[in-house]
Amino acid sequence: MSERKVLNKYYPPDFDPSKIPKLKLPKDRQYVVRLMAPFNMRCKTCGEYIYKGKKFNARKETVQNEAYLGLPIFRFYIKCTRCLAEITFKTDPENTDYTMEHGATRNFQAEKLLEEEEKRVQKEREDEELNNPMKVLENRTKDSKLEMEVLENLQELKDLNQRQAHVDFEAMLRQHRMSQEQWQQQQEEEDERETAALLEEARHRRLLEDSESEDEAPPSRPRAAARPNPTAILNEVPQTKRKAEALCSKAQLAGLVVPKKVKTEANGASEQVGVPTAAGAPKSRKADNPTPQTPGTSSLSQLGAYGDSEDSDS
């Protein structure tokens, strides 16, 4: 069996490497690569904006008869994402950038313009200093002044940082928090005072209105008679029961009273009972009664006799 991984290869005795034909490819052969847009651009066909960093499947080729210090220049072909129009741009090794060729316009980039301006100023300065020694001295003086200003600003920043380093931010926050709490407490006290003042004013106004209404009020009407309680009839004692109780009490009182025995006198004055009536006064039914009454009876006996007379009349 042969080996799974062949390490040695067989070369026949008549092997000649020069006889192996070489693959000849065109010099402008294109390769498909994956790249991102190197700058912001706008399509000339449809006006679609293509932002920097958008990915494309591009075709890459080498530009013929163009090079910078032996470095080849490459051209890329992409298609617009909206109208599929072809857009081409190529590398610029001299400025380490890309240049737009066809199909789109490059959008404004302030950073690139700033870099170009700095390069232009630097180049002009070098050209002036090349043949003018006084210009070199003047530029050095300006540079030294500028350096001194920068150092002074840097020292001020350092001093400021040192001053801020000794500041206790926690204490500042606590103080601010305390002041805020005091302000809130003061606001609450003011609200309470205003509320108390409003309540006092309302009470005073109500008292004034009550006094004025009492002065102008009409005389009070008599109160209506109280309505009887509907359940009071349940607690009433029947009239017959009240009469029976009254009779029992009268009989008991009559039994308790004992009339005093008085000797009968011969004259007719002893037969008169009661107090003589005034002249012209009507005689009562008791005066017509011929039954004699004992003059020595007590008030309880008279009360019992008065009750008996009422029962007889009824």
Swiss-Prot record:
Can you cite an annotated GO cellular component?
U2-type catalytic step 1 spliceosome
Per the record's keyword annotation, is Nucleus included, yes or no?
Answer: yes
Bias kind Low complexity: ranges: 222-232
GO terms for molecular function, please? metal ion binding
Q: Does the keyword Lipid biosynthesis apply?
A: no
Region: Disordered; residue ranges are 178-238, 253-314
One Pfam family, short name please?
A: Saf4_Yju2
- Annotated signal sequence is none
Report biased composition (Basic and acidic residues) as residue ranges.
Answer: 200-209
Residue spans of biased composition, Polar residues class: 290-302
Q: Which InterPro entries match?
A: Saf4/Yju2 (IPR007590), Yju2 (IPR043701)
Task: Give residues annotated as binding Zn(2+).
Answer: C43, C46, C80, C83
Alphabetically sorted, this entry's keywords are: Metal-binding, mRNA processing, mRNA splicing, Nucleus, Phosphoprotein, Spliceosome, Zinc
> Which biological process terms from the Gene Ontology are attached to this UniProt entry?
generation of catalytic spliceosome for first transesterification step; negative regulation of DNA damage response, signal transduction by p53 class mediator
Q: Please list the residues that carry the modification Phosphoserine.
A: S211, S213, S220, S309, S312, S314
Subcellular location(s): the record lists: Nucleus
Subunit and partners: Component of the spliceosome. Present in the activated B complex, the catalytically activated B* complex which catalyzes the branching, the catalytic step 1 C complex catalyzing the exon ligation, and the postcatalytic P complex containing the ligated exons (mRNA) and the excised lariat intron.
Which HAMAP family does this chain map to?
YJU2 (MF_03226)
Q: What does this protein do?
A: Part of the spliceosome which catalyzes two sequential transesterification reactions, first the excision of the non-coding intron from pre-mRNA and then the ligation of the coding exons to form the mature mRNA. Plays a role in stabilizing the structure of the spliceosome catalytic core and docking of the branch helix into the active site, producing 5'-exon and lariat intron-3'-intermediates. May protect cells from TP53-dependent apoptosis upon dsDNA break damage through association with PRP19-CD5L complex.
Give the family, as the similarity comment puts it.
Belongs to the CWC16 family. YJU2 subfamily.
Please name the PANTHER family in this protein's record: SPLICING FACTOR YJU2
Q: By what name is this protein known?
A: Splicing factor YJU2
Q: What is the lineage of its organism?
A: Eukaryota, Metazoa, Chordata, Craniata, Vertebrata
